[in-house]
Amino acid sequence: MLERTLRVLEYNKVKEQLLEHTASSLGRDKVKNLVPSTDFEEIVEMQDTTDEAAKVIRLKGSAPLGGITDIRSNVKRAKIGSMLSPNELLDIANTMYGSRNMKRFIEDMVDNGVELPILATHVAQIVSLYDLEKKITNCIGDGGEVVDSASDKLRGIRTQIRTAESRIREKLENMTRSSNAQKMLSDSIVTIRNERYVIPVKQEYRGVYGGIVHDQSASGQTLFIEPQVIVELNNALQEARVKEKQEIERILLMLTEEVAVEADIVLSNVEVVANLDFIFAKAFYAKRIKATKPIVNNERYMDLKQARHPLIDPEIIVPNNIMLGKDFTTIVITGPNTGGKTVTLKTVGICVLMAQSGLHIPVMDESEICVFKNIFADIGDEQSIEQSLSTFSSHMVNIVDILEKADFESLVLFDELGAGTDPQEGAALAISILDEVCNRGARVVATTHYPELKAYGYNREQVINASVEFDVNTLSPTYKLLIGVPGRSNAFEISKRLGLSDRVIEQARNHISTDTNKIENMIAKLEESQKNAERDWNEAEALRKQSEKLHRELQRQIIEFNEERDERLLKAQKEGEEKVEAAKKEAEGIIQELRQLRKAQLANVKDHELIEAKSRLEGAAPELVKKQKVNVKNTAPKQQLRAGDEVKVLTFGQKGQLLEKVSDTEWSVQIGILKMKVKESNMEYINTPKQTEKKAVATVKGRDYHVSLELDLRGERFENAMARVEKYLDDAQLASYPRVSIIHGKGTGALRQGVQDYLKKHRGVKTFRYGDMGEGGLGVTVVELK
């Protein structure tokens, strides 16, 4: 990536802001060395990594990166045999703790179900050196001093030192409190000179105390004397201090050697936490500028939704939708110089640079960006004083360099292309330069105030015009990018707002060709149409999102309903099976009793015994069967029943003989030795009549039964449909269904009306309604049963 491109697009300013979010010099070094990548896979991984760190921040608010310092030079010194200071060793211990703490932090989140595959891979490389960490912290205090407990020998030496110091102070304090002390001493204090305890003695009394003079005051009137009586004690104290120093050095060398043994692991851990500091800095920066993760594609197109420049306050900048690379490869932004065109140009460039650096970009979700091998930018007035180049020449030198290197994997940004020279020649050069880079397949965004380039976008298939909206009422740009609408100068409107007379403005209009006026009017209408279309699109998008939300909610409710329905049906089926099984056992017992009755002399069987047995047999049927009375289709053809016909009673699966018809729908039937009333719908005709045989019931068979939750009438004739509805509702009631659906379709509405007219009269219907969204709407009637 060209250094000039990074400079003019203010990439380093973004890095300066990123630096503010690092926790250590390790992370700061990573930021300082950050440059955009051109490798697609690497960029995707960097974006995913930043996204995981952003997820951690959303869930936890921060990451435990405190206490980590750059200890690499200290570790390398330990590796070559140098002795580390207590503070240097303490920094190593703190960094080891920080890396271990970070590892535990990420692993705990993963254990709790948070998906962080990339960060988990990073922390998996951290090797815990807990033993070494504890050795250092056990020997060195938070203030950087070697503590007494570092070794038994050091504790003993320091006990000796404290004892010696106490004895010396006691003797000297006795001297300062003597009767002659006020006369001979300059001050009644005990002090230290050259690491030995002394007292301040007046010059004329130096011989009274004897001993050694270690210092004197500036005036020479006071001598700091070590009295003879404590010289031996001071000597003993100094010997103990030498031993203390030797023991401390031994401890520090021991710890340094242990660091040297683990040096490679420590350095590896440092590299991991440096990367983690860098990664989380990017995530914190994304939060600061309200950035999101872009979708990175390899198809050479970008779609930036509501893009903002990261260096401009998000509260004041106007976001823009910027698309490039699909329907068109070049955007030519025309309009006046003060219209915010350069901000749009820089927004495109800096977003690409940030994305290719693994940074999230200030756009809305689902924005897409592609990878460019080269990004070229000719922006701003960078004329060279040393080379005595004009503005035009300076730009042209840069453009020549761009034309030598640009290809189909390049993004080229031109600001005020062709400016700084004769307008006619500048416009011609601009068109020629744009043609050249477009023909190479590069993606191009160019700004210009030349009106000649307005037609350029209409004459080239892959080029589109754009402009930055200008509010003539406030005389300022709105910075709203209008794709597909060329810019206009607004000179007449601005002049009128500023007070120029209508007469002068009208004369000015007369100096412009009719075609130019028509073009300006056309552009004005395009701007208005663009704004209206954008407003309509925003409203439609809001409705779409609302519809999707409702759809998701309905899907969730349907899934929950189906799950609950299936659970209840399963429970009901299980209960039904248990009841049927119990009924079978009870029926078998009753049948056994009837067999015993048959074996007995039939004349001796009392009527009440038969009635009781019949009642118990009917009561043995499970509840569902008793409600249904075998609600099944009679597979036999319709037959005019007569007394004496043999039939099969479906409830019990037994044959019987018709005795007499007791009502329009019921017959008296002889089943073995039992006589009972049976509905015609509960019997099946048998072709071969037999004489009634009195025999006991042998078996009672159960029968599977199923009724669908919906009835589909589409394609049925009206009469057949009504008959099916009648039977279906009876079946559904017998199945104890609380709710069913009847599908009649929309069509002409005749079948729908017929169904609902019938439902109004049916005594088993509680309420009914049309289907809701997701249930079939007007093509379905949902029936609530009593």
Curated annotation (Swiss-Prot):
It comes from Bacillus cereus (strain AH187). CDD domains: ABC_MutS2, ATP-synt_Fo_b. ATP binds at G335, P336, N337, T338, G339, G340, K341, T342. Residues 711-786 form the Smr domain. Endonuclease that is involved in the suppression of homologous recombination and thus may have a key role in the control of bacterial genetic diversity. This is Endonuclease MutS2. Its EC number is 3.1.-.-, 3.6.4.-. Belongs to the DNA mismatch repair MutS family. MutS2 subfamily. InterPro entries: DNA_mismatch_repair_MutS_C (IPR000432), DNA_mismatch_repair_MutS_core (IPR007696), DNA_mismatch_repair_MutS_sf (IPR036187), MSSS (IPR046893), MutS (IPR045076), MutS2 (IPR005747), P-loop_NTPase (IPR027417), Smr_dom (IPR002625). The keyword Hydrolase applies. Keywords: ATP-binding, DNA-binding, Endonuclease, Hydrolase, Nuclease, Nucleotide-binding, RNA-binding, rRNA-binding. GO terms for molecular function: ATP binding; ATP hydrolysis activity; ATP-dependent DNA damage sensor activity; endonuclease activity; mismatched DNA binding; ribosomal large subunit binding; rRNA binding. Homodimer. Binds to stalled ribosomes, contacting rRNA. GO terms for biological process: mismatch repair; negative regulation of DNA recombination; rescue of stalled ribosome. It comes from the Bacteria.
